[in-house]
């Protein structure tokens, strides 16, 4: 594909999408004027701020506005979809737009979709560690996961469109995402802040059941770097990154048991004087939903184990510590973010910070 190119980014006001937008604005091809970015944004006020202060184009719409989403997708070379992995209608509309473009021009749209290893969970409820680790150098096990599972319907749509050939699709499957975001609005992740809020509310760190189940983690900046690795490969003539039936990309760098994470949260919050004890306790089954919300057995008590393969083959170089050190060391900053965002006077808009970071 010849430059310049046009990108449609969804989720720009969110944690992952906002960090992706910040990284796009730092790229040399963007600074050189070779990239046009259009963001799908819900809400006139947010859209206006992003357009005026960051200088990117916006389309104001909800993901449910299929006609608007379809048209926006039909006009771009690249779709980077981070907004919602469980909204197949919008994924379908984007693919329909890409198909219209292909039928008109013969050009494939590059489609990078942010899914998640929530699709690979079990129902352990913290009771055991499953030895199964999903791999991505052969995606047969991933493809075998039913499309009724979380994320899988949208993933399957993109895979089939990639096989058909009108998009060059990549389904990136991050595990728990940690770290501080760099976008214009939401800068906190989901799972660790939720566990911190629960610990503050219950005055003790908690885990689902015995907490023996195992998950993985990845820093948000390392995740975003994989998006751009795939993008650059797709834009190049070499195109080494597999797509089609092998379009799934895992990106785990950290491994932890839920009880280990809970113990680390308890230790660090107790050291700050935020909770009266460092000891973590198991939640009883009847306590889980009240403590952590719906689907908590899966989000905080399942096994979801994966190993990055193809990303490393392409030259992915995560910058944050692997094992569990990077993940555990992020807890202090996640705690600070939870406290900051809980204050009425806390800044909810980070566009000035983004501009300072960009030197503008």
Language-model segments: residues:
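Conserved beta-loop-beta element that borders a ligand/cofactor-binding pocket
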Residues: 155-183, 193
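NAD(P)H-binding glycine-rich loop region in Rossmannoid oxidoreductase-like domains
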Residues: 41-105
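N-terminal Rossmann NAD(P)H-binding glycine-rich loop of SDR-like oxidoreductase domains
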Residues: 2-31
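Terminal hydrophobic/aromatic helix or amphipathic segment near a protein terminus
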Residues: 240-241, 248-307
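Conserved Rossmann-fold NAD(P)-dependent oxidoreductase catalytic core, especially the SDR/UDP-sugar
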Residues: 10, 96-156, 170, 180
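Amphipathic terminal alpha-helices
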Residues: 321-360
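Glycine/proline-rich active-site loop of Rossmann-fold NAD(P)-dependent oxidoreductases
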Residues: 179-193, 230-248
């Amino acid at each position: 594909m010849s430059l310049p190119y046009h990108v449609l980014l969804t989720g720009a006001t969110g944690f992952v999408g906002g960090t992706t937008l910040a990284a796009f604005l730092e790229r040399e091809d963007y600074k050189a004027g070779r990239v046009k970015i259009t963001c799908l944004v819900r809400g006139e006020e947010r859209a206006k701020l992003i357009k005026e202060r960051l200088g990117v184009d916006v389309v104001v719409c909800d993901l449910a506005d299929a006609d608007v989403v379809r048209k926006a997708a039909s006009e771009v070379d690249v779709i980077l979809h981070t907004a919602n992995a469980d909204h197949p209608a919008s994924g379908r509309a984007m693919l329909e737009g890409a198909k219209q473009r292909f039928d008109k021009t013969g050009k494939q749209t590059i489609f990078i979709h942010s899914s998640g290893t929530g699709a690979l969970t079990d129902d352990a409820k913290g009771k055991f560690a499953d030895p199964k680790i999903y791999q991505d150098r052969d995606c047969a096990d991933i493809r075998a996961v039913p499309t009724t599972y979380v994320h899988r319907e949208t993933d399957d749509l993109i895979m089939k469109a990639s096989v058909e050939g009108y998009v060059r699709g990549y389904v990136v499957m991050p595990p728990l995402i940690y770290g501080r975001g760099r976008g214009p609005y939401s800068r906190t992740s989901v799972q660790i802040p939720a566990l911190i809020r629960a610990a503050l509310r219950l005055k003790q760190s908690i885990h689902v059941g015995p907490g023996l189940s195992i998950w993985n983690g990845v820093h948000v900046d390392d995740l975003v770097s994989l998006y751009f690795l795939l993008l650059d490969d797709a834009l190049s003539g070499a195109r080494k990154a597999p797509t089609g039936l092998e379009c799934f990309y895992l990106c785990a760098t950290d491994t932890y048991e839920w009880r280990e994470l809970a113990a680390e949260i308890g230790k660090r919050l107790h050291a700050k004087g935020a909770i009266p004890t460092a000891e973590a306790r198991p939640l009883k089954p009847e306590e889980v939903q009240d403590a952590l919300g719906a689907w908590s057995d899966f989000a905080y008590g399942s096994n979801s184990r994966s190993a990055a393969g193809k990303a490393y083959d392409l030259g992915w170089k995560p910058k944050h510590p692997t094992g569990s050190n990077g993940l555990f060391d992020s807890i202090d900053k996640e705690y600070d973010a939870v406290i900051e965002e809980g204050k009425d006077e806390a800044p909810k808009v980070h566009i000035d910070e983004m501009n300072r970071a960009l030197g503008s």
